[in-house]
Structures are given as C-alpha cells and as structure tokens.
C-alpha cells in the first residue's frame, strides 16, 4: 500500500518541478528591453550619473554662453561645486600614496619589487616614446601651423628661459627631499633673476669720505656702466613634491617588508589606513557627477571668444585629438592584447569610471583614488600591483602629455616659419619624453614643461601663451589618456607578475601554516602541563605512612610545588 502511494505521488512532484522550471526559464524572454536596460543602468548607477554629469555640464555650458554676458560671481558660483570636488580628491592624494605604496611593497620581497618596478618602467618609457613619435608624425603630416596664424593671434607673453640642466637637477633634488613634511606642500625649483651689478670703483673710498658723504646727504648716482647679470638660486614653490614622497615611501615599504613579523603592527596600521581612505573615496565618488558637471560648465562659460579660438587653432586641436585617440584607443589596447591575449575593450569598460573622472578633473593624481577602485574591484587586479604601479605611473607616465608637447613644439615652429631638421625633430621627441616624465601630475603641467622643449630647439618661448586658450580642453583629453595608460600598464604588469605573486602567496601560506602548527603545539603543551599540575600532589607524609583519604590544599601562591597533603580530621591518629 505504501509503495502504491509513493508511486502515485511521484508524478505530481515531477510535474510541479517541471512547471516551476518552465516558468523560470520563460520569464526573462518576456521581459521588456527597457526593463533590462534599466536593470543594467541600476547596477552601474554611479557610472551612469557621471556620464550624465559630463553631458549635462557641456550642454549647460554651451547654452549659457548664448545668454547675455554672465557676471563673474555667477560663473564662480556655478563652478564652486566642482572646486569642492577637486579639493576633496586632492585631500586624499597624500594618505593614499603613503598607504598604498607601503602596503603594496611590504607584501613583496626585494626581488619581486625590483621585477615589478623594472616591468613598469619599461612599459612607461616605451609607451611615452611611442606617443611622442606619433605626435611628431601627425604634426608633420597634417601641418596645422601657418605663419599667417601668428599675425592673427598676435604676440605672446615673454617667458623666462628654462635650462634643461637646471630642470634635470631639480628633478633629482626633488627625488631626495631634505624635509619630508615640507615635501607634502612644497617642491624646490631653480629660479633665475636679473640683478643690476655695478662695476668695481677705480679708487677705494676711505672711511673719512664715507662719513662726509653721509653727513652731507650726498646721493650717489648709478653709473652708466651698470650691467644686468642673471643669477640662479633655489626657491621652494607651492605644490606637493609627489616624486620625493614616492621615492621615500618606496624605500620605506621595502625596508618594512624585510623586517617580516617585527613590522606586522605597522603593516596592519597602513592596511587599515588604506581601507579607510578607499571608504572615503566611495563617499566622494557619489558627489563626483555634480562636481564634474559644474567643473565643465564653469570652464566652458569662462572661455572668451571660443568661436574665434576654435577657428584659429582648430587644426592644431584636431591634430592633438587625433593623436590622443589613436594612442589611447588603438596603440595602448593593442599592446595590452599582444602581451596578455585578453580583450582590451572589456578592460577599458572596467576603467571607464576613472576615464570619465579624469576627463572632468584634468588631474591624474586627483583621479588616482578612482583608478584604484576600478582596477581592484572591477577588474580584480592584485592590490600589490596597483598600489605600487599606479602612484608611480600617475607621476612619471604621461603619454598624452608627451604627444601634446611634441605636437605643440613643432606647431610653434611651423607658425614661426622655422623648418626643423632631422636632428631637431629627434631632439623634440626625446625632450618631450623626458619632460613628460618630470611633469608633476597637476593641471596644465604640460605648458610648464613645454618651455624645456622650445628652449632645447631654440624656438620662441613667448608663443606658449597663444596655446593657453585651448588648453582647457586638450588638458582634459591628454589627462584621460594618461590615466588609461597607467591602467593598461597595471594590467600588463599584473599579467607578467602573476606567477611570482602566486609563488609569494604560497610561501606566505606555508609560513602561516607552520606558525599555526607551532602555536597549536605550544597551546597543547601548555594545556597538558596545566592538567598534569592539577592532578599532581606533593606528599608531605613519611614514605611508610599510608593515607587512605586525603585532601589537597593549594598554597596561596598557586604553585604545584607548594601543595600539601593532610589527612581528614576524623582519620588522624589520636
């Protein structure tokens, strides 16, 4: 009877299961395309809001330009939320660089750190040279410069000449800061000053004539032979010395990694600090859509004569933009695919949030917290790689800047009717590469390093001011390419170093297992020792006395050796 009931119930159970599975499989097919799109956008809500903020800022800025002249205070208020965003991002740069470098390098041995650094530097220098050469080829092929533009744009502002030797020495000086606290907000720079120097007098004035001249209030006129002499000196300029901080904390992290368990407390501290900073990054990123929209809108409104500038420097802008698109959209993904054999476009989708943020903020260092989050959470790249490669890359890997500087230098030469020979073109390429390495990761740093290139090939430095009108757009685009280059570099270095990182992880696991075994063994020994001590008695009676029943009395100090045995009162001999 039971078997008959089981046989009758079996088809019902099977029928119900088939019915449930049928409903589950057919439901997604009938879902509307709009609902699926909304679900997709909901999962990437922050990215969607950021893209919407960029579009909204550009549209609102263009519409407000059509209105009557806007008061500067109104423009300032429109851009104010964007200014707050930049301040918050820059606020996190210092703790993020410190914590990321130390935590990343402390988990690696010296050999692994050296290999990671070597691979990163080879990638950085290779892509920067490729970008500079691409810029030279495009500007020579398109030839955007025309001597007639010089008459339309007018004369530029005179700039102080910069020596390549001084710039190189300043780079080395900043790499070794004399005061670590001062390096957080200042960096050293060689400054040239023009000083009036009078020739030495023919006759030395004695003390009497000097006193008489003072009593008579005689005014000595400056002799006509006075000469203008240029003197050099070192001065501290405002701005974080990122290069010096990176150099120090790289050494600090490697030294702490060599200490092993002795530095575990410090490693835990910086790990917690890094996690706290990343939590703050997530909070700030939900504010970024509004800040980026206000930044772009305010910048577009503040531009004067946008149409005239676009007409005069349109071909120059097109040359730079084409070069950035080719380098960031073709060359970098191609290098990533050749090395890793992985889809570069899915990788780019993972860093799209960082790319949009760089486009809005125009700062590689300001985008650094977002880049960390994209690579570690979206793409699953090892934190030891990102925390070492990204801070260094944000400082010295400037592919977009190298391309921009090469194009701008040759454009200025074409605008002045100067024909550069092969040697000068090579000089422009090499100088653009080296100057981009020394450029600080701050907005419009390319205009500062441009002085080095123009001085190296003997071009007028005052023409740099003519390019400032369009730098607001090109700065954002080259910064976004810089961030993309840093991200692809982290992915390539992680792919090449994955086996070594796995080996280090396995060694750490073996070490942890050994430590756990030792700890368990010590714990078991202590437990057995306590159990044996609790059962141990030290008999004070004579060997010939046999005690049938006894009571163990522990001494006040709790030691087993102080135990005594005494008979119960009713068992004692009378």
UniProtKB/Swiss-Prot annotation:
Lipid moiety-binding region (S-palmitoyl cysteine): 38
Transmembrane portions of the chain: 45-64, 88-108, 121-142, 236-259, 269-296, 318-339, 385-411, 472-493
Pfam family, one: SDF
Membrane-related topology note: Multi-pass membrane protein
Residue list for modification Phosphotyrosine: 539
PROSITE patterns attached to this UniProt entry: NA_DICARBOXYL_SYMP_1, NA_DICARBOXYL_SYMP_2
GO biological process assignments: adult behavior; cellular response to cocaine; chemical synaptic transmission; D-aspartate import across plasma membrane; glutathione biosynthetic process; L-aspartate import across plasma membrane; L-aspartate transmembrane transport; L-glutamate import across plasma membrane
Segments dipping into the membrane without crossing: 345-375, 425-458
Binding site for Na(+) 1: 393, 397, 482, 486
Post-translation changes: Glycosylated. Palmitoylation at Cys-38 is not required for correct subcellular localization, but is important for glutamate uptake activity.
Glycosylation sites: 206, 216
Chemical reaction(s) catalysed: K(+)(in) + L-glutamate(out) + 3 Na(+)(out) + H(+)(out) = K(+)(out) + L-glutamate(in) + 3 Na(+)(in) + H(+)(in); K(+)(in) + L-aspartate(out) + 3 Na(+)(out) + H(+)(out) = K(+)(out) + L-aspartate(in) + 3 Na(+)(in) + H(+)(in); D-aspartate(out) + K(+)(in) + 3 Na(+)(out) + H(+)(out) = D-aspartate(in) + K(+)(out) + 3 Na(+)(in) + H(+)(in)
Keywords from the named record: Amino-acid transport, Cell membrane, Chloride, Disease variant, Epilepsy, Glycoprotein, Lipoprotein, Membrane, Metal-binding, Palmitate, Phosphoprotein, Potassium, Sodium, Symport, Transmembrane, Transmembrane helix, Transport
Residues bearing the modification Phosphoserine: 3, 21, 25, 506, 521, 532, 534, 544, 560, 564
Binding site for Na(+) 2: 395
Family of this protein: Belongs to the dicarboxylate/amino acid:cation symporter (DAACS) (TC 2.A.23) family. SLC1A2 subfamily.
Function: Sodium-dependent, high-affinity amino acid transporter that mediates the uptake of L-glutamate and also L-aspartate and D-aspartate. Functions as a symporter that transports one amino acid molecule together with two or three Na(+) ions and one proton, in parallel with the counter-transport of one K(+) ion. Mediates Cl(-) flux that is not coupled to amino acid transport; this avoids the accumulation of negative charges due to aspartate and Na(+) symport. Essential for the rapid removal of released glutamate from the synaptic cleft, and for terminating the postsynaptic action of glutamate.
Free-text domain note: Contains eight transmembrane regions plus two helical hairpins that dip into the membrane. These helical hairpin structures play an important role in the transport process. The first enters the membrane from the cytoplasmic side, the second one from the extracellular side. During the transport cycle, the regions involved in amino acid transport, and especially the helical hairpins, move vertically by about 15-18 Angstroms, alternating between exposure to the aqueous phase and reinsertion in the lipid bilayer. In contrast, the regions involved in trimerization do not move.
Oligomeric form and interacting partners: Homotrimer. Isoform 3 can oligomerize with isoform 1. Interacts with AJUBA.
Name of the protein described by the UniProt record: Excitatory amino acid transporter 2
Lineage, opening ranks: Eukaryota, Metazoa, Chordata, Craniata, Vertebrata
């Amino acid at each position: 009877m039971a078997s008959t009931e089981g046989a009758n119930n079996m088809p019902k159970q099977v029928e119900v299961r088939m019915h449930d599975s049928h409903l589950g499989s057919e439901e997604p097919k009938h879902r509307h395309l709009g609902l699926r799109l909304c679900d997709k956008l909901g999962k990437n809500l922050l990215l969607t809001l950021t893209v919407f903020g960029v579009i909204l800022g550009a549209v609102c800025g263009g519409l407000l330009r059509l209105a009557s002249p806007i008061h500067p205070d109104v423009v300032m208020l429109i851009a104010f939320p964007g200014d707050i965003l930049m301040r918050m991002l820059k606020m996190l740069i210092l703790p993020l660089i410190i914590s990321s470098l130390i935590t990343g390098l402390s988990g690696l041995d010296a050999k692994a750190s050296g290999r990671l650094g070597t691979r990163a530097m080879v990638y950085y220098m290779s892509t920067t040279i490729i970008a500079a050469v691409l810029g030279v080829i495009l500007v020579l092929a398109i030839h955007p410069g025309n001597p007639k533009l010089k008459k339309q744009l007018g004369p530029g502002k005179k700039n102080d000449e910069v020596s390549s030797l001084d710039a190189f020495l300043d780079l080395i000086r900043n790499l070794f800061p004399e005061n670590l606290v001062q390096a957080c907000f200042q960096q050293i720079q060689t400054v040239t000053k023009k000083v009036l120097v009078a020739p030495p007098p023919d006759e030395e004035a004695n003390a009497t004539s000097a006193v008489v001249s003072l009593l008579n209030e005689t005014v000595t006129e400056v002799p006509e032979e006075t000469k203008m002499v240029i003197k050099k000196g070192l001065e501290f300029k405002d701005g974080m010395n990122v290069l010096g901080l990176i150099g120090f904390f790289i050494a600090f992290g490697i030294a702490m990694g060599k200490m092993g368990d002795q530095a575990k407390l410090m490693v835990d501290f910086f790990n917690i600090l890094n996690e706290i900073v990343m939590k703050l990054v997530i909070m700030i990123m939900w504010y970024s859509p509004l800040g980026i929209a206000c930044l772009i809108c305010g910048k577009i409104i503040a531009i004067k004569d946008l149409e005239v500038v676009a007409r005069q420097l349109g071909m120059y802008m097109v040359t730079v933009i084409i070069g950035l698109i080719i380098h960031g959209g073709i060359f970098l993904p191609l290098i990533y695919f050749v090395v890793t054999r992985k889809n570069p476009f899915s990788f780019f989708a993972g860093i799209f949030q960082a790319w949009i943020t760089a486009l809005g903020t125009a700062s590689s260092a300001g985008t650094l917290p977002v880049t960390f989050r994209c690579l570690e959470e979206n793409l699953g790249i090892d934190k030891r790689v990102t925390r070492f490669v990204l801070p260094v890359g944000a400082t010295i890997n400037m592919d977009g800047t190298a391309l921009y500087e090469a194009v701008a230098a040759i454009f200025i030469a074409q605008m002045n009717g100067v024909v550069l020979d092969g040697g000068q073109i090579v000089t422009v390429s090499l100088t653009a590469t080296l100057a981009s390495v020394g450029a600080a990761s701050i907005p419009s740093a390319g205009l500062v390093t441009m002085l080095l290139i123009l001085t190296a090939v003997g071009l007028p430095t005052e023409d740099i001011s003519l390019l400032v009108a369009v730098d607001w757009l090109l700065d954002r685009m080259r910064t976004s390419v810089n961030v993309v280059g840093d991200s692809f570099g982290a992915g390539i270095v992680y792919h090449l170093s994955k086996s070594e990182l796995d080996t280090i992880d396995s060694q750490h696991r073996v070490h942890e297992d050994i430590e756990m075994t030792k700890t368990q063994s010590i714990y078991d020994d202590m437990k057995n020792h306590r159990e044996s001590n609790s059962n141990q008695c030290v008999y004070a009676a004579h060997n010939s006395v046999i005690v049938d029943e006894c009571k163990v009395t522990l001494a006040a100090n709790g030691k087993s050796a102080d135990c005594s045995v005494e008979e119960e009162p009713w068992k004692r001999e009378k």
